């Protein structure tokens, strides 16, 4: 209000009854509250102080309903402008009109008289900050630069009041959770924090801390059929051998047979002989120390321009790079293998030469160094290799040909090809395609890759060599490049990168916290968010470790930090926004009511979003991968704890912040004003030039902040709602196609790229890293690696009986393998079993997948026909007449043998084979410690070659499975529990990742639907949210496929959490839509976007920054985590904002459609909970079409203005009138009938399709924002409009506030009705002249049930002539700009404020005043522009104990936004007592 305005009011004007809704109230006396100066003091002696005024509560309860009063009454009394301590009123001698006297002295200088009354006893202090209703008092020298720009339309001085109220202390029992939070915030916050801290401490101190030494542990499947069989087969091999529970031979027979002892010793003697022969071969050349092997460090070379490495230049380059890059460092000499050379009596130790192509060619040509090679020698060596390569590729040339050149396969190999150098070059040093079967005939074969084996074993000691000489250095020389390497330090280097790159996750977390701080302008809330996340994670670790008894803690569990920070970001933004919205009420409600309102809506949103996210995180529990299951349990528990804790720390933090911010601002404000409040205007600038720079910088920041705020308001209050609603057809089609395309890409073609290696060699660094290139590309290019992995080798099929396939270890601990379980029902000695096992041999050999043995292959590799071998062995044994055939297994025994004879003969045959060295290496029988047969293992080769192709391996597995199940069903009783296993570990991992990842995603979507249905009880909204979440998840997975991500355990873990990360944003819109104060779909959609658009976009933008920040990380875990968070949050934001809202535009629930109602709670829910489906029907006379909630009971209450409801805005108002005491006329009720009734319930008319050409659209740019924050204005009006409880309470316990007193561009005589002119008491000219300087506008709180289209106006009889006062244009505009913060944004909340048809033309200005009819548009409909700045009421209340004696019949004028446009006359006949 301008300082020059004059306050005019009746002498006997009444203050509103400040009774609360909790019970009856007593009209309390007005408190003497000292005025607080709004201007800086001139000196220290004139500093304004705020003195608390103690108000003693009545300690004695009375039976009278008017015996008690609350802090709510006190705060409302303090908030009224006329109740303040002010100078005495001047009384006009002519008309008796009173006006407050104006003083030139700041009110703050009058406080000294009251300072002595400040109480020193413990008291409760309530603060009320509301716009000042008093004229601003400023000194002549003002420090305007400290307050920023004072725009008349935006700036309103704020007056701080402090009231001290004594309460009953500990004897007062809180009635609700919000009351506990408001009265004891510090106690509640500290108590909950201590509980969580105690749990965290217990989790840390109980047992060992997590071990991250093996970051890749736990990414293998556990619990599947194949994994259980592979684990059992592994344990069977581990438990077989000397000194172990099982043995391949009966130990009783081996102890008696000396041949067995000699044979047992023959194997190590054979190895020693081979080692001596290899040493003798190397000693002839006197060059290499040993043979190359996979235990040595390896470097892969390739030509830069794809040229062949088989050239003298390339060979020189490889030798040179080895010398400069590897051997030049002093650390290499300490780690390399050393060979001793004797020079006379001296011994010289030097590093062994590397196994490189150049050195082998030097050996073949009998030269000392690779630098001495010539082109001719290189060509001759190529010819030798070309000649010997076919023998290598057909399997004839093997490593043993050097030792046994005349036996077995080596007999056909030429002598000059039996050199170890030929085999080692082809086997180790060159790629598989060099001189292969397809390229051996090429004239100039191409050598693409070549390996160099360093004489250093793989170990962590090579870490320094890599970091000092290889990482970050140029690895190219003469167009030859080192592109891959395997130094055995991949795991250690990964942990090194994790530690070095940890700065990126820290920066990402800080980005989320800074986003919270900047958005909410509170570092305290950001710090509390971090504390809440830490306590939630540590408490979840306590439950993870103590309650769930899980010992394995994978490294990726730490990624839950970003998930919880994002959850805290969403919770804090929505909660604090709504809290600030409650504070923007004029005046704000008491803290208890505000907190109760915020917890009802935002607490509900937090619970719905948090519970849904937590349960979807738990969906990863159904996965078979251990790390994914552990991550699901930990993240789900942490999210649940964080959700529950958010309902404690968020409200407590806001109460504490509000409580202590007032004290700090008052203390700091006085000190901050001293340097600049000098008598000399230039004193501020003369103090220091640094202050001018700081002031300029601060002004720039303010300007930037205001510009950003205006842009945000324009985007999220206008552009985004209009864009979503008007282009909903495009959005729903576009995102539907995006979801369908993502589903097709991720599930059908091409699908996620499955891993080509087991989990131990998973990708840890970027694809361009030399370690990753070796594992992904070069490992499959060399024959020694391919043979080690069994690639392109026939797969072995193993059939096992006697052992139960079980995994009785802890499935949540990869190190817990369990024990071996023996089948007690195993019996292979029965007659039926012997016959079935004999027939099984022929059945296997007749299968298409069986690979028969060649004549050159060792029969020990295949024991499928061991029964036939036993029959043959028994038949060739000759027994004498004195010998017992059954005891010595002679030829006189017919088959099938008696069970005891079968076991004895079988044991003897195995002992004889073992003595001869023909015992199968892996198959055969397993004997227990007593010599009995405990298990049977049958192994044979198949025609299927080992492959990484999932489809090929799946076809082979299904073929074997169907055949084996068919055969085992016909087996005798003792053999029916057999099972098979093969090299299916990679296939099992691929199968789990390809199927279970999609199953987890689908299950999480189903859980989303279930949880939303349980929390919202609305089927359509739950379905739409589930569709949006599913589309977001599959679109994200489709984008990951397009980014060529390989589906490993890490990726599966991320995808399992995708639904939980996507549901937050959709839940925000869903709850906001269901609580919107609109009955039509489009209005609810616009409301939810305006309310939640900014927090959702801010959260998505914060995660976008997180992804960008983590991109430079070398560790692939951080990079993928950042990319995944970026994609899933941005895609979820798009689907929530555009797809979900578009679905609601088309099929959003209304009129209770889809809502599950329980009969026992229907009545209560309709009274206390905001209904998401209005009962409004198109074409009915219902003001709810304009965006207001129903105020009464029931979900289908209609608020109309016809005689049926007796002309009341709310149903409860009728009952309220009935309770009024009889006396005088009822106050007149006036309203704008054409805007409130008979409007179509459509968002189209209120947004973009208004038929009124001159009226601006609700979402158009013609609307001018008023107030400090348009977004707060909009939110305040919309929140107040949707509170049915507050509306009901206001009508029951509050008095009607005063009517709006304003000016009109019409003349005085045009505003009064002739028949009422004689009844009015006219003010004198002096009073009228004083009133032209300004007007007193009552600033009262908007009722929560009122909206801009439901304006109820009452008028007292003694202020009638004030309506006839006219003002100048500039005075009129200042009034409109300085009114309460209920700005024209309230119109945006209305669904339908435009007119549906055009009335008659504008009447001429010369017509008499009789033609202007009250309650009608008076022919100005096409130019009507309303600027409803304040919802106004009459302060006089019949319930206050005094009855008004007269009522004015003059209609109320609602001013137009432009002075040249006509005002609107509105009038509605009030109902008397009888009529009500």
Curated annotation (Swiss-Prot):
Region called Disordered, residue ranges: 1-84, 1447-1476
Subcellular locations according to the entry: Membrane
Q: Pinpoint the SSD domain residues.
A: 495-656
Membrane-spanning intervals of the chain: 185-205, 506-526, 528-548, 550-570, 602-622, 635-655, 729-749, 1000-1020, 1023-1043, 1047-1067, 1098-1118, 1121-1141
- BP term (GO), one: smoothened signaling pathway
Q: Where is the composition biased (Basic and acidic residues)?
A: 1465-1476
InterPro entries xrefs: Dispatched_Hh_regulator, SSD
User: Where does the UniProt entry place glycosylation sites?
Assistant: 58, 366, 478-479, 817, 827, 846, 1245, 1339, 1391
Provide this UniProt record's keywords sorted from A to Z. Answer: Glycoprotein, Membrane, Transmembrane, Transmembrane helix
Task: Write out the similarity annotation.
Answer: Belongs to the dispatched family.
Name used for this protein in its record: Protein dispatched homolog 2
Taxonomy-wise, where does this protein's organism fall, top ranks first?
Eukaryota, Metazoa, Chordata, Craniata, Vertebrata
């Amino acid at each position: 209000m301008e300082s020059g305005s004059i306050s005019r009011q009746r002498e006997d004007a009444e203050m509103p009854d400040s009774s609360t809704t909790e019970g009856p109230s007593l009209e309390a006396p007005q408190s003497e509250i000292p005025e607080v100066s709004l201007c800086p003091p001139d000196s220290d002696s004139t500093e304004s102080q705020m003195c608390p005024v103690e108000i003693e509560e009545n300690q004695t309860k009375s039976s009278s309903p008017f015996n008690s009063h609350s802090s709510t009454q006190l705060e409302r009394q303090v908030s009224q402008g006329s109740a303040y301590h002010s100078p005495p009123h001047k009384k006009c001698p002519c008309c008796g009109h009173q006006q407050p006297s104006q003083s030139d002295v700041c009110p703050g200088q009058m406080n000294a008289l009251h300072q002595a009354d400040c109480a020193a006893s413990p008291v409760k202090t309530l603060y009320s900050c509301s716009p000042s209703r008093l004229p601003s008092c400023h000194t002549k020298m003002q420090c305007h630069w400290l307050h920023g720009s004072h725009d008349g339309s935006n700036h309103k001085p704020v007056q701080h009041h402090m009231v001290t109220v004594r309460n009953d202390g500990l004897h007062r029992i809180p009635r609700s959770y919000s009351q506990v939070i408001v009265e004891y915030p510090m106690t509640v916050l500290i108590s909950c924090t201590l509980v969580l801290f105690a749990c965290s401490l217990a989790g840390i101190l109980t047992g060992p801390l997590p071990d991250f030494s093996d970051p890749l542990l736990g990414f293998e499947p556990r619990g599947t059929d194949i994994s259980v069989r592979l684990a059992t087969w592994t344990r069977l091999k581990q438990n077989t051998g000397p000194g172990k529970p099982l043995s391949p031979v009966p130990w009783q027979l081996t102890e008696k047979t000396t041949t067995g002892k000699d044979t047992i010793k023959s194997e190590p003697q054979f190895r020693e002989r081979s080692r001596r022969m290899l040493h003798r071969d190397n000693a002839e050349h006197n060059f290499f120390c040993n043979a190359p092997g996979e235990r040595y460090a390896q470097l892969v070379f390739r030509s830069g321009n794809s040229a062949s490495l088989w050239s003298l230049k390339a060979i020189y380059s490889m030798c040179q790079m080895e010398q400069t890059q590897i051997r030049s460092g002093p650390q290499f000499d300490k780690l390399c293998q050393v060979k001793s050379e004797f020079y006379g009596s001296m011994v010289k130790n030097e590093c062994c030469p590397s196994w490189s192509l150049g050195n082998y060619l030097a050996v073949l040509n009998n030269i000392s160094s690779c630098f001495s090679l010539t082109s001719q020698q290189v060509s001759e060596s190529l010819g030798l290799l070309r000649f010997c390569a076919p023998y290598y590729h057909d399997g004839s040339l093997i490593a043993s040909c050097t030792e046994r050149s005349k036996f077995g396969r080596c007999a056909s190999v030429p002598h000059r090809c039996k050199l170890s150098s030929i085999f080692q070059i082809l086997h180790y040093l060159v790629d598989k395609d060099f001189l292969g079967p397809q390229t051996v005939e090429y004239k100039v074969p191409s050598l693409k890759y070549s390996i160099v084996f360093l004489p250093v074993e793989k170990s962590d000691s090579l870490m320094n060599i890599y970091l000092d000489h290889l990482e970050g250095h140029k690895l190219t020389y003469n167009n030859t490049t080192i592109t891959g390497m395997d130094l055995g330090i991949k795991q250690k280097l990964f942990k090194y990168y994790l530690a070095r790159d940890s700065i990126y996750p820290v920066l990402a977390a800080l980005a989320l916290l800074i986003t919270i701080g900047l958005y909410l302008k509170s570092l305290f809330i950001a710090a509390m968010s971090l504390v809440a996340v830490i306590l939630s994670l540590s408490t979840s670790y306590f439950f993870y470790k103590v309650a769930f008894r899980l010992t394995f803690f994978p490294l990726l569990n730490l990624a839950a930090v970003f998930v919880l920070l994002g959850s805290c970001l969403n919770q804090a933004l929505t909660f604090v926004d709504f809290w600030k919205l409650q504070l923007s009420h004029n005046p704000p409600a008491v803290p208890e009511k505000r907190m109760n309102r915020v917890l009802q809506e935002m607490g509900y949103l937090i619970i719905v979003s948090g519970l849904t996210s937590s349960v979807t995180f738990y969906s990863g529990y159904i996965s078979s991968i251990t790390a994914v299951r552990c991550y699901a349990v930990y993240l789900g528990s942490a999210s649940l704890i964080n959700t529950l804790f958010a309902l404690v720390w968020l409200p407590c933090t806001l109460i504490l912040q509000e409580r202590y911010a007032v004290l700090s601002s008052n203390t700091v404000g006085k000190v901050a004003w001293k340097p600049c409040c000098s008598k000399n205007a230039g004193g501020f600038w003369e103090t220091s030039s640094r202050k001018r720079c700081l002031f300029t910088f601060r002004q720039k920041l303010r300007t930037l902040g205001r510009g950003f705020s205006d842009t945000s308001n324009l985007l999220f209050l206008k552009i985004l709602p209009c864009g979503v609603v008007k282009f909903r057809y495009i959005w729903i089609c576009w995102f539907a196609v995006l979801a369908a395309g993502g589903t097709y890409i991720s599930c059908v073609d091409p699908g996620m790229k499955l891993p080509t290696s087991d989990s131990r060699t998973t990708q840890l660094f970027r694809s361009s890293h030399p370690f990753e290139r070796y594992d992904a590309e070069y490992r499959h290019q060399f024959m020694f690696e391919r043979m080690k992995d069994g690639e392109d080798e026939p797969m072995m099929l193993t059939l096992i009986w006697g052992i139960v396939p079980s995994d009785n270890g802890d499935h949540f601990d990869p190190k817990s393998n369990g024990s071996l379980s023996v089948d007690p029902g195993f019996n292979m000695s029965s007659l039926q079993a012997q016959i079935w096992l004999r027939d099984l041999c022929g059945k296997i050999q007749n299968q298409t997948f069986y690979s028969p043995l060649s004549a050159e292959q060792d029969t020990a590799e295949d024991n499928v026909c061991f029964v036939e071998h036993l029959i043959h062995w028994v038949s060739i044994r000759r027994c004498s007449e004195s010998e017992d055939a059954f005891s010595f297994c002679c030829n006189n025994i017919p088959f099938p043998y008696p069970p005891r004879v079968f076991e004895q003969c079988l044991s003897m045959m195995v002992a004889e084979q073992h003595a001869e060295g023909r015992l199968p290496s892996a198959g055969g029988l397993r004997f227990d410690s007593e010599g009995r047969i405990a298990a049977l293992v049958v192994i044979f080769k198949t025609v299927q070659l080992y492959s990484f192709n999932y489809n090929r391996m799946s076809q082979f597995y299904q073929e074997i499975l169907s055949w084996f199940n068919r055969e085992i069903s016909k087996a005798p009783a003792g053999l029916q529990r057999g099972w098979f296993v093969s090299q299916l570990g990679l296939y099992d991992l691929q199968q789990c990742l390809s199927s279970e990842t999609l199953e987890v995603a689908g299950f999480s979507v189903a859980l989303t639907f279930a949880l939303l249905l349980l929390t919202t009880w609305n089927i359509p909204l739950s379905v739409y949210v589930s569709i949006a979440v599913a589309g977001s998840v599959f679109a994200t997975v489709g984008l990951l496929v397009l980014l060529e991500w390989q589906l490993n355990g890490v990726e599966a873990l991320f995808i399992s959490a995708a639904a939980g990360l996507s549901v937050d944003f959709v839940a925000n819109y869903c709850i906001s839509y269901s609580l919107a104060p609109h009955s039509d779909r489009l209005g609810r959609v616009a409301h939810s976007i305006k309310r939640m658009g900014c927090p959702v976009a801010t959260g998505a933008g914060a995660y976008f920054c997180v992804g960008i920040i983590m991109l430079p990380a070398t560790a692939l875990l951080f990079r993928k985590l950042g990319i995944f968070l970026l994609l899933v949050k941005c895609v979820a934001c798009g689907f929530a904002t555009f797809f979900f809202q578009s679905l609601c535009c088309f099929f959003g629930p209304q009129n209770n459609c889809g809502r599950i109602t329980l009969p026992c709670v229907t009545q209560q829910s309709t009274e206390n909970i905001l209904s998401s489906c209005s009962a409004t029907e198109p074409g009915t006379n219902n003001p709810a079409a304009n965006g207001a909630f129903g105020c009464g009971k029931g979900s289908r209450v209609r608020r109309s203005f016809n005689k049926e409801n007796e002309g009341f805005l709310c149903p409860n108002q009728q009952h309220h009138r009935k309770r009024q005491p009889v006396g005088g006329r009822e106050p007149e009720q006036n309203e704008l009938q054409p805007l409130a009734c008979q409007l179509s319930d459509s968002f189209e008319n209120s947004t973009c399709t208004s038929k009124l050409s001159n009226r601006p659209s609700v979402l158009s740019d013609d609307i001018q924002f008023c107030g400090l924050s348009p977004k707060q204005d909009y939110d305040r009006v919309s929140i107040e409009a949707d509170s049915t409880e507050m509306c009901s309470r206001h009508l029951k316990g509050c008095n009607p506030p005063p009517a709006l007193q304003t000016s009109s561009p019409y003349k005085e005589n045009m505003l009064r009705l002739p028949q009422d002119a004689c009844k009015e008491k006219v003010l004198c000219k002096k009073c009228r002249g004083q009133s032209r300087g300004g007007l007193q506008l009552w600033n009262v709180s908007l009722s929560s049930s009122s909206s801009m289209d439901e304006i109820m106006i009452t008028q007292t009889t003694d202020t009638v002539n004030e309506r006839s006062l006219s003002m100048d244009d500039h005075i009129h505009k200042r009034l409109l700009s300085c009114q309460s913060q209920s700005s024209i944004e309230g119109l945006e909340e209305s669904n339908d404020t435009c007119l549906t048809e055009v009335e008659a033309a504008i009447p001429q200005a010369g017509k008499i005043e009789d033609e202007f009819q009250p309650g009608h548009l008076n022919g100005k409909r096409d130019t009507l522009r309303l600027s409803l700045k304040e919802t106004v009421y009459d302060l006089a209340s019949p319930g206050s104990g005094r009855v008004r004696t007269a009522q004015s019949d003059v209609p109320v004028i609602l001013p137009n936004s432009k002075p040249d446009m006509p005002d609107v006359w509105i009038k509605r006949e009030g109902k008397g007592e009888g009529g009500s």
